[in-house]
């Protein structure tokens, strides 16, 4: 996401690759990537890590090898404030 220009850059690239029939995959940031892959015509693989799970109130769920994308506003995630506080720099 960060090297393609964020969500807007992804959508521009997805339009080009979709027209050419070229598959697109993501690298890192599954909490964002899951959403853009849902609207990518040639979505291929979503790279998955569970790294953010300890700091989310409701970690993403997988079913039959596929992510269940939250339908909540924004990114669909909510931070566990107590868990996040453990990692704060003081």
Feature map (PLM): residue ranges:
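Shared catalytic-loop signature of beta/alpha-barrel
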Residues: 1-66
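C-terminal extensions of enzymes
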Residues: 56-90
């Amino acid at each position: 996401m960060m090297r393609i220009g964020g969500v807007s850059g992804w959508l521009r690239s997805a339009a080009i690759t979709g027209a050419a029939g070229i598959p697109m995959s993501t690298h890192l940031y599954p909490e964002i990537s899951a959403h853009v892959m849902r609207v990518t015509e040639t979505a291929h693989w979503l790279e998955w890590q569970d790294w953010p799970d300890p700091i989310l109130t409701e970690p993403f769920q997988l079913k039959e090898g596929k992510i269940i994308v939250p339908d909540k506003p924004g990114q669909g995630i909510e931070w566990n404030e107590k868990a996040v506080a453990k990692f704060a720099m003081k």
